[in-house]
Regions:
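Non-catalytic interaction/Regulatory regions outside core domains
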Residues: 70-86, 93, 443, 451-454, ...
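Mid-length scaffold segments of soluble, non-membrane domains
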Residues: 192-195, 237
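Disordered, charged N-terminal biogenesis/targeting segments of membrane/secreted proteins
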Residues: 1-50
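Non-catalytic, conformational "gating/processing" segments within enzyme and secreted inhibitor domains
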Residues: 88-114, 135, 164-174, 181, ...
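Soluble, non-membrane globular domain cores that form compact, hydrophobic packing
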Residues: 83-85, 383-389
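Extended hydrophobic
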Residues: 298, 351-366, 478-511
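Flexible propeptides and autoinhibitory/regulatory segments associated with cysteine proteases
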Residues: 79-193, 476-480, 507-508
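Single-pass transmembrane signal-anchor helices and their membrane-water interface zones
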Residues: 10, 27, 57-81, 470
Length: 511
């Protein structure tokens, strides 16, 4: 189906929605508006896009035009949850019920808006979805700048030192795990965590975590972004109910109970991790087990899938050389000529380009200058400021020859040393750790903090998953120009979600 046909259909949607489209997705809406205006003067009216949005925030919601194209061309389906295996049900105390998302209406079911009757029916079906997007963005505004410090500090702490390896980190996934850790601790143990997360109290943390979760939850048949949480308990211990209820109500945490260290309990634990990450981290999950000494364990996950607003065409792919730290390697590069709305950003030691996703999110690619390593760049305050700046001064509209290697990168890391450098220390020391909100048992400590993540990029879009496992044991030790932006040497990437939340960041040394 041609883009022009879809644009004609767009023209028939109510002025209210079209004006809102300009507000939510200004670049794409203006292009369509300009084309429509040459055929009909009464198109988009005089609505204007907001100015001064943060460079990481591309739009408030998925505009109708983008979703029309995504649904009609890609036939995207949402990630399906709720089908728990019998292995899990045998251990379940409480299983979280995710909010039911209103589906984005398929324009094909409404004759692609070819009549007034179909237009009205589409608008009626569209209204609940639209209301949910507004709610997501109202939650996003509640996040504010309080998390900027955590995003910056943790990205630097967990990505540096990759050397020749790829490294992938999901800040939002680790954030949710740390927020739950704060809930099960007290005293200085809790204070160190909430200080890192940029809040003054656990009550403020709950409001912040709710905003982050709600703003970045999507499962409407077009967009998929699912944050999952779970709590794993012993069957021979009693735990304090208030904190268990808080974890269930605020973090959508499912609770499971059984014999720690048993084969069946570990099978259930691994099943939950695999189900929540679509089976894309099975090799890492295989190594995640709960020991006989485990008092409790927390797990958080994210499953994310999005299509490019403008997909790559595989016929334009070419084989080229990627200059890996381990030596030159041949890889397949995708190509796009960004001749409409392309913007090049730069700093003293890097250049950056944004590629938009069809869910109001973006993926950014940060390329160190020649002679500058990724590790060196991660030590620079400027690149960290770039992640969270309201507006970046060094930018220019350009026609960009964009070359991106197809990649599937993953990593698993131990977060403990990184968390200690970030100021979270007491939970690792059995003589200092305070877990009194969940149990009166003394001498416990955080013995495990593992994080695994994977990001796959191809012609159609992005799929990304991550999990974090934390285990508590008994105490033991302006002018249009052209530029070529060829990502043919190690680079950084970032997938930014609703409300400037970094969903995934990573280092690609070996595409």
């Amino acid at each position: 189906m041609s883009r022009e046909y879809l644009e004609d259909a767009m023209q028939e949607i109510s002025d209210e929605y079209l004006e809102e489209a300009i507000e939510w997705k200004p670049a794409e809406a203006r292009v369509i508006a300009k084309r429509q205006k040459t055929r009909k003067d009464e198109t988009f009216g005089k609505a204007h896009a907001r100015k001064g949005v943060r460079i990481w925030r591309v739009a408030v919601a998925l505009v109708t035009a983008a979703a029309l194209i995504a649904t009609a061309v890609f036939g995207i389906g949402g990630f399906r949850f709720g089908r728990r295996s019998s292995v899990l049900k045998a251990f379940a105390i409480n299983e979280a019920e995710y909010p039911k998302a209103s589906p984005y209406p398929d324009p094909a079911k409404f004759g692609f808006l070819d009549s007034k009757e179909n237009q009205e029916a589409f608008s009626e079906a569209f209204a609940p979805w639209r209301a949910e997007q507004k709610n997501r963005w109202s939650q996003a505004s509640a996040i504010g700048d309080g998390l900027d410090g955590f995003w910056q500090q943790s990205i630097s702490a967990f990505l540096k030192g990759a050397r020749e390896e790829n490294r992938v980190y999901s800040p939002v996934n680790v954030y949710m795990a740390l927020a739950m850790l704060a809930e099960i601790t007290d005293g200085d143990s809790r204070q160190q965590v909430i200080d890192l997360l940029g809040v003054k109290s656990v009550e403020e943390l709950r409001e912040q975590a709710t905003a982050v979760w709600t703003a970045n939850y999507m499962n409407d048949g077009v967009n998929t972004s699912i944050l999952g949480s779970s709590l794993w308990l012993r069957n021979d211990m009693e735990y304090k109910k208030p904190v268990l209820e808080t974890l269930a109500n605020t973090y959508y945490a499912s609770s499971y109970r059984g014999e720690m260290g048993s084969e069946k309990m570990n099978q259930a634990f691994q099943t939950w991790l695999n189900e929540q990450t679509g089976g894309l981290l099975e090799d890492y999950v295989e190594g995640e087990t709960l020991s006989e000494e485990t008092i409790l364990a927390l797990a958080s996950t994210i499953y994310y899938q999005a299509k490019w607003t403008n997909e790559f065409f595989d016929k334009k792919n070419e084989t080229g050389v990627f200059h890996s730290p381990a030596g030159d390697v041949q890889c397949e590069f995708m190509y796009e000529y960004m001749d409409l709305g392309g913007t090049y950003y730069w700093g003293e030691k890097f250049g950056a380009v944004e590629k938009r996703l069809d869910n109001s999110h973006s993926m950014w690619f940060i390329l160190p200058d020649e002679g500058v390593s990724v590790d060196e760049l991660l030590q620079e305050a400027e690149v960290m400021d770039f992640f969270t700046a309201d507006r970046w001064e060094n930018q220019k509209a350009m026609n960009i020859h964009f070359y991106l290697p197809k990649f599937d990168v993953s990593s698993k890391m131990d977060l403990r040393e990184g968390l200690k450098t970030l100021g979270v220390t007491d939970v690792f020391d059995g003589s200092l750790a305070d877990f009194s909100t969940v149990t009166d048992l003394k001498g416990m400590c955080l013995s495990k903090a593992n994080h695994a993540a994977r990001v796959t990029v191809d012609e159609e879009g992005v799929t990304a998953v991550a999990y974090t496992v934390m285990e508590v044991d008994g105490a033991r030790p302006s002018q249009e120009e052209e530029i070529e932006f060829r990502l043919d040497r190690p680079f950084l990437f970032a997938i930014m979600g609703t409300g400037d939340v970094p969903l995934f960041v990573g280092v690609v040394n070996q595409p």
